[in-house]
Amino acid sequence: MEKEQNKKTSSLNVLAIAGLQPYQKKTDEEYMNEKQMLHFKKILETWKNQLTIEINHTLLYIQDKSTNFPDPIDRAAQEEEFSLELRNRDRSRKLIKKIQETLKKIKDKDFGYCNSCAVEIGIRRLEARPTANLCIDCKTLAEIREKQMAG
């Protein structure tokens, strides 16, 4: 079920589910105009709705599969499966929160710019990860710093 959920919640798959094509920017088009904002709003709302459906599906799945196995190994396997499902559900819940924050940025007309350096994040990066809040350069630097702190 985990592979099925990851397949469904990919932001690029959400683009297809929303019935949208990758945004075709015109040469003289202003960055993050109304048309672009609407494009990303549709992507984010579709993604949020898909995640909500999957969260509800997880709850029903656990309720349906909940059996009291007499064998301790079977019980342990079931508990491990439920633990993974609940972890996925928690991850989805956190992603929904991030999507809601991003939708607020769109509403406030503050979407598409790096939180660190205020540079345009870029249409293609945002289509790949609509909740991105750092440009690729700042994200790369943040990941390098994170690796240095960990290792």
Curated annotation (Swiss-Prot):
Q: Which InterPro entries match?
A: DksA_N, DksA_RNA_pol-bd, DnaK_N, Znf_DskA_TraR, Znf_DskA_TraR_CS
**Gene name on record?**
dksA
Q: Which PANTHER family match?
A: RNA POLYMERASE-BINDING TRANSCRIPTION FACTOR DKSA, RNA POLYMERASE-BINDING TRANSCRIPTION FACTOR DKSA-RELATED
Q: What does this protein do?
A: Transcription factor that acts by binding directly to the RNA polymerase (RNAP). Required for negative regulation of rRNA expression and positive regulation of several amino acid biosynthesis promoters. Also required for regulation of fis expression.
SUPFAM superfamilies from the xrefs? DnaK suppressor protein DksA, alpha-hairpin domain, Glucocorticoid receptor-like (DNA-binding domain)
Q: Which NCBIfam families match?
A: dksA (TIGR02420)
Assembly and partners are described as: Interacts directly with the RNA polymerase.
Keywords recorded for this protein, A-Z: Cytoplasm, Metal-binding, Zinc, Zinc-finger
Origin superkingdom: Bacteria
- Source species, please? Buchnera aphidicola subsp. Schizaphis graminum (strain Sg)
Q: What are the recorded GO MF terms, alphabetically?
A: zinc ion binding
Please provide one cellular component term from the Gene Ontology annotations of this protein.
cytoplasm
Which family does the similarity line name?
Belongs to the DksA family.
Location in the cell reads: Cytoplasm
ZnF (dksA C4-type) intervals = 114-138
Q: What is this protein called?
A: RNA polymerase-binding transcription factor DksA
Q: GO:BP terms for this protein?
A: regulation of gene expression
Specify one Pfam family: DksA_N
Lineage, top ranks: Bacteria, Pseudomonadati, Pseudomonadota, Gammaproteobacteria, Enterobacterales
